[in-house]
Amino acid sequence: MKGLENAIRNLNSLDRQMVPRASIWAVNRMAQKAVSVATRKVARETVAGDNQVRGLPLKLVRQRVRLFKAGTDGKRSARIRINRGNLPAIKLGAAQVRMSKRRGKLLYRGSVLKIGPYLFRDAFIQQLANGRWHVMRRVNGKNRYPIDVVKIPLSGPLTQAFESATQSLIDEEMPKQLGYALKQQLRLYLSR
């Protein structure tokens, strides 16, 4: 068993930080991939506006996610912080108020607020007491303050997308990424 003893001696002589570095590298790669996959899915599948336009700008969804990477300083796990609050419609772009002159499903009476491809019926832009500008709309059923900010709900889609993306990536990709990372660390160690 001369070869086995030689292999054990070689493995023991390797840098003891090699495996932790490889695992940190793989964890960070998986976290970045989870953020990318989930934000693209949410941006592609979210429906906004009264005309039910599918899709949001990817930049708006990506701004709501922050990745804290794993490091060699003892923090061996990556953390993803997600702002799951609703997205105000004013963030979608420059707004135009149009009076509707045509007949149609959405353009039948009153004014229509158009922000990019998204239409919001009976909406208007107003500066709030805190100084921010928002798209507002009259809301039925609210007694005291019958107007409300127009928002696009993102809580459900973001939660679902991140849970499914992280679970599938951990099951399928993590072993491959760990293998790649260990090979890379070994190559770096042997090339010294």
PLM regions: where:
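Short, Lys/Arg-rich flexible segments
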Residues: 1-192
